[in-house]
Swiss-Prot record:
The keyword Phosphoprotein applies. The gene is PRPSAP1. GO terms for molecular function: enzyme regulator activity; magnesium ion binding. The keyword Isomerase does not apply. This is Phosphoribosyl pyrophosphate synthase-associated protein 1.
Length: 356
């Protein structure tokens, strides 16, 4: 890749090894140096950021991966963006491969849409643009008052399937719940493979969460016109577990955008084994793996878990050889180069559809 012109800097928003490593990969591809800054925690628990070079009039790209300590990472990003804003940076672009709180983008019970709040906070801190990957809900882009480029990791994962999975032509793409069916269908159509969907008790809990709001309370003494009686919504009842599609004697490839609830993938793998699948892969963009995840994966019927490096998971990878990583620094560095040079981003979205 050709080095971008002067007038931009790339900073790492935290000092963790994973974030620094991703930032170094990106700057190496760009032929640039990593910006000088210090991010650390005070003894009183506060986050402090110091920018150690001039950024006046430059385009600044902040790389921020989201480790298990999500709130600290968010504060690091906000404080660094604000520090760069007050230092007169021309544009401040956040490169946030996994956007935090993306699962809280819908109203649940008497909660709040936290993702919308975070979007407002980032704008207030000084960000003018965001580069991210595979938002949990594509509608999240509408929460922002500035441009958001939602890149896709699927080309990298599709390439991995074709190059690293032996006899992948004998595979079937599996959605572990009906809400993942569109993503799975996209993979199946591009690879010219069959599709299977797991439905029933193993389906995603997010689909079945009731609203939970029952207020205002019923007014006992009010007179209600007989013609105004409202029909009540029927309660949901999950059907018995079913696999729609044939996986017998096949390689099963479960695809999703996020792996955070490892137990649900383990349960799906057990079901597929019972239905005759002889090898099981799990593929996702974001591997948000808990401390227990390596043990659960190692003891399960899953043969391999493939995720990208949008989220740090090096410790879990050392504990479980089944976990494999696909590097996506290439597309992030190309996005940075194009944005800084004012080039079209269309090349990065070739053949991408709304279901990808």
């Amino acid at each position: 890749m050709n080095a971008a012109r002067t007038g931009y800097r790339v900073f790492s928003a935290n000092s963790t090894a994973a974030c620094t490593e991703l930032a170094k990969r990106i700057t190496e591809r760009l032929g640039a140096e990593l910006g000088k800054s210090v991010v650390y925690q005070e003894t009183n628990g506060e986050t402090r950021v110091e920018i150690q070079e001039s950024v006046r009039g430059q385009d600044i790209f902040i790389i921020q991966t989201i480790p298990r300590d999500v709130n600290t990472a968010v504060m690091e990003l906000l404080i660094m963006a604000y520090a760069l804003k007050t230092a007169c940076a021309r544009n401040i672009i956040g490169v946030i491969p996994y956007f935090p709180y993306s699962k809280q983008s819908k109203m649940r019970k008497r909660g709040s849409i936290v993702c919308k709040l975070l979007a407002s906070m980032l704008a207030k801190a000084g960000l003018t643009h965001i580069i991210t990957m595979d938002l949990h809900q594509k509608e999240i882009q509408g929460f922002f008052s500035f441009p958001v480029d939602n890149l896709r990791a699927s080309p990298f994962l599709l390439q991995y399937i074709q190059e690293e999975i032996p006899n992948y032509r004998n595979a079937v793409i599996v959605a572990k719940s009906p809400d993942a069916a569109k993503r799975a269908q996209s993979y199946a159509e591009r690879l010219r493979l069959g599709l299977a969907v797991i439905h029933g008790e193993a389906q995603c809990a997010e689909m079945d969460m009731d609203d939970g709001r029952h207020s205002p309370p019923m007014v006992k003494n009010a007179t209600v016109h007989p013609g105004l009686e409202l029909p009540l919504m029927m309660a949901k009842e999950k059907p018995p577990i079913t696999v729609v599609g044939d996986v017998g004697g096949r390689i099963a490839i479960i695809v999703d955008d996020i792996i955070d609830d490892v137990e649900s993938f383990v349960a799906a793998a057990e079901i597929l084994k019972e239905r005759g699948a002889y090898r099981i892969y799990v593929m996702a963009t974001h591997g948000i793996l808990s401390a227990e995840a390596p043990r659960l994966i190692e003891e399960s019927s899953i043969d391999e878990v493939v995720v990208t490096n949008t989220v740090p998971h090096e410790v879990q990878k050392l504990q479980c050889p089944k976990i494999k990583t696909v590097d996506i620094s290439l597309i992030l560095s190309e996005a940075i180069r194009r944005i800084h040079n004012g080039e079209s981003m269309a090349y990065l979205f070739r053949n991408i559809t709304v279901d990808d």
